[in-house]
Amino acid sequence: MSAVLPGNVEAKRRILQVIQQLELQNPTPDPFQESRSSNNDTSSSRGDGLNPVAELLGDWELVYANNGTVVTRTGFAQGLVQLAGKLPGFGLTDIVQSLYVDEEHPGCVRSTNQAEFALGPFGSWRVAIRGSWLPAGQQQPSDTVLVVFDEFGVQLTGWLVKLPRQLPEVRIRLPGSASKQQQGRPAALWRTSYLDGAYRVGRGSSGNVFLFRRR
């Protein structure tokens, strides 16, 4: 819960100072290994795909976010967080980002951002938002990608007690072009400003800062 409500202004300032010190010692300044490029086009993408280092991939648990996450930033999620401290059975846990290479589309990194919502008598639900990491363009630093969200998912995981079997997830594709994922879909620039075997720092274009720990 502290990852969603990270404290007052002074606490955020101290945490940000620690993160900035980490970034100054970043052992992986180019997490995409100078992503391969087939031409010199600087208008649309850095190349024809991403080439992530192995340390980037896998499951990452959110430790800190200065302004919530794409899953928890809604009014509903914030209201649930407030209820968690007042009513038993309500809460928000398991905020995880999973990264893997898309085997069907080489050069594309897929991401899943998910969290577990406990709604008391209404059960526990896993909410996920999926998307692709794509080249951000020659004008962007090599540690920066374009994140395009393309799918929303929700799954019932418990109802008063743990369910005896896993129910299927309901998936909803976000509107947009299938051939050009950027068109008509939510997108944002994302920078990996620190990466080692255990921790990762990501920064959004709007100033949001995220600290992850490998699961």
Language-model features and meaning:
Residues 2-215:
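Soluble ligand-binding/transfer domains with enclosed cavities or grooves
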